[in-house]
From Swiss-Prot:
Pfam families, A to Z: ProQ, ProQ_C
InterPro entries for this protein: ProQ, ProQ/FinO, ProQ/FinO_sf, ProQ_C
Compartments reported by the entry: Cytoplasm
CC terms in the record's Gene Ontology section: cytosol
Composition bias type Basic and acidic residues, residue spans: 144-159
Function: RNA chaperone with significant RNA binding, RNA strand exchange and RNA duplexing activities. May regulate ProP activity through an RNA-based, post-transcriptional mechanism.
Record's protein name: RNA chaperone ProQ
Stretches the record annotates as Disordered: 105-179
Xref: Gene3D superfamilies: ProQ/FinO domain (1.10.1710.10)
Source organism per UniProt: Enterobacter sp. (strain 638)
Principal location class: cytoplasm
GO BP, sorted A to Z: post-transcriptional regulation of gene expression
Length: 227
């Protein structure tokens, strides 16, 4: 027991649980809903293995059940499982609604953080541009004229080219009816003052599931969608 390797992070504990109980936990992909009270089952089965403590198990379980992939699996009709994968009852509507709100709040936090980071980058770039010292240009010495040479007439300066009219800021059309959308359709998702390209994956009663160019998918309400 003394020579057993120690798991130092919740992610390592989750990977261990996925290997130890593959019919219950998964290290990637959509996760299955867990039995209510599964923490006590875990304590009885694995406490002491890999030098695991109750605190480590509780932290790993909290991280696992708050992940997006776990919350995606909380759907009406889905069945909870125990450590061995045996069914332990269907999810009720209250738990499904709670998971949906958790997922929406988590996505909103991520979008807000990204918008804040982009705003800080723009502010930093603007500040660096204003504070950068300008180099003074030294005047060039005038060329010496040969007294015997004739003065050449100055060439007329070409007329200044007309500056092109500034491009009008692109305006986006808000999506008023999500039922008019179709799977595979391209649109944009508003995040702060920015609009990110996305593709429609699914139209649900809660909104539209889209996939960003980064590969991340999320459910977005109609007021955050534009063309």
């Amino acid at each position: 027991m003394e020579n057993q390797p120690k798991l130092n992070s919740s992610k390592e504990v989750i990977a261990f649980l996925a290997e130890r109980f593959p019919q219950c936990f998964s290290a990637e992909g959509e996760a299955r809903p867990l039995k209510i009270g599964i923490f006590q089952d875990l304590v009885a089965r694995v406490e002491g293995e890999m030098s695991l403590s109750k605190t480590q198990l509780r932290s790993a379980l909290r991280l696992y059940t708050s992940s997006w992939r776990y919350l995606y699996g909380i759907k009406l009709g889905a069945t909870r499982v125990d450590l061995d994968g045996n069914p332990c009852g269907e999810l009720d509507e209250q738990h499904v609604e709670h998971a949906r709100k958790q997922l929406e709040e988590a996505k909103a936090r991520v979008q807000a953080q990204r918008a804040e980071q982009q705003a800080k980058k723009r502010e930093a770039a603007a500040a660096n541009g204003e504070e950068a010292p300008r180099r003074e240009r030294k005047p060039r010495p005038a060329p010496r004229r040969n007294e015997n040479s004739e003065r050449k007439p100055r060439a007329e300066k070409p007329a200044a080219k007309a500056q092109p009219a500034p491009r009008e800021e692109q305006r986006h059309t808000p999506v008023s009816d999500i039922t008019a959308l179709s799977v595979g359709q391209s649109l944009k998702v508003k995040a702060g003052n920015n609009a990110m390209d996305a593709t429609v994956l699914e139209i649900t009663k809660d909104g539209v599931r889209v996939q960003l160019t980064s590969g991340m998918s999320m459910i977005v309400r109609a007021e955050h969608l534009v063309f």
